[in-house]
Amino acid sequence: MDVNKNGYIFTFATVMVVVVGVLLSGLAISLKPFQEANVSMEKKQDILSTVGYPKSETPREVANQLFGEVFKEQYALKIDGSIADGIQPFDISLAEELKKSESERVMPLYIAEKDGEKLYVVPLRGNGLWGPIWGYVSLRQDLNTIYGASFDHKTETP
C-alpha cells in the first residue's frame, strides 16, 4: 500500500478520528460520576464557607460529612414561603429555577447552628460583566446581618 496516495491518507485520518472519538466518549462517560461528585463537594464547600468553614481548611472529603452535621435543617421553599415536599434542597439548580415563572420556582434554604445561633444560608445568582455569577450568603438570626458570603463565576476575563 502506497502511503503517499490520497486514499491512504483519508483512510488513516478517518480511522484515527473514529478511534480517538470512541476513546474520548468512553472516558467522558466513565468519568461523569467523578465529575458530578466533585461538583457536589465543591458546592458543599462553598455553602460551608459562608458559616465559618473556609475552603482552605475544609478538604472536599471532609466537606461531605461536615455538611450533614452543620446543616441539620434544609428546605425547598415555594414563593409564598411554604415548604415544597419531595424536593431535595441541595439538588435545586438556581439557574434552572430562575427560568421558571415566579409561581413555579422553588428555592433552597439551609439552616446551620453555630455557637448557639441559627444562620440562614440562601443562594444568589446574577449576571456579571463577562458571564453569570453565583454564590451563597449566610444571614444571622435577625435576617438583616450578613454572617458570611461566598461567590464564584464560570470563566476568567476574556
Describe every region a protein language model picked out.
Residues 2-158:
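Flexible, solvent-exposed loop/hinge segments and secondary-structure transition points
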